């Protein structure tokens, strides 16, 4: 079993936690960096990919972005923005000497990849795996309200619409509607059979999520509300594997928009998967992940 190393990187006067699976070897295989979703979701679910370190003899790096998990802090709304999180990724690469790497990002992590490639133009990135991310907050909002919400019971649609109209995101009816929405399009298929790392209590970054994104998945009101990169996807020169689930918050239109816009990209639409394809379709996903990274090492 691969060696696990944990540590902290100083960042903006705070500490960013990281977890490394496996060791760097002179085998031509670049490490894989994992960018979690949220903002504020923690690295935990990426531990399902620990096996890739052994199966592919490759070092894997995951971390809790500032504001959540073992990097938790709150009371700092000035920190919850794209630049802080992208600078943190850049700092982590320098801190750990990850001059060459592959990067996988899920949900918000996929947004990070898109902005990182376009705005930072980083060197040494072998490939991207964009898992259920998106290039446009307005597209994500439209798909959430137009496509996903309209499959829900009318009383739940009414509760969501009332919250959006009034700005009051509280109450039993609203909470029940959001829970149903997330269960349909986000939560793991596996239920009680989910891996321990997916059920483990975690210190989510609630403040970073609300300040960065908004009160729920379909109402971006935070600092990322103007995240719009559709017209610039052609600037991404990094080979990109796009993955999404058939019942995903990342609708087929969102995923296809990325696949159409990013040169040298490939799209896999997973059946029996929601917003975390690498959990719901773990074994098949790992096969494709390993195949993709080896192609571009």
Predicted segments with their positions:
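N-terminal cap/lid segment of alpha/beta-hydrolase-fold proteins
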Residues: 1-15
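Conserved HGGG/HGGXW glycine-rich cap/lid loop of the alpha/beta-hydrolase fold
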Residues: 14-74, 78
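Active-site acidic short loop of glycosyltransferases
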Residues: 94-100, 122, 237-238, 264
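Active-site loop/oxyanion-hole signature of alpha/beta-hydrolase fold enzymes
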Residues: 61-108
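Alpha/beta-hydrolase
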Residues: 148-151, 155-238, 257
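Conserved loop-alpha-helix segment in the C-terminal half of the alpha/beta-hydrolase fold
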Residues: 223-273
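Catalytic active-site module of serine/aspartate enzymes centered on a nucleophile-bearing elbow/loop
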Residues: 264-297
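Conserved hydrolase catalytic core segment
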Residues: 99-143
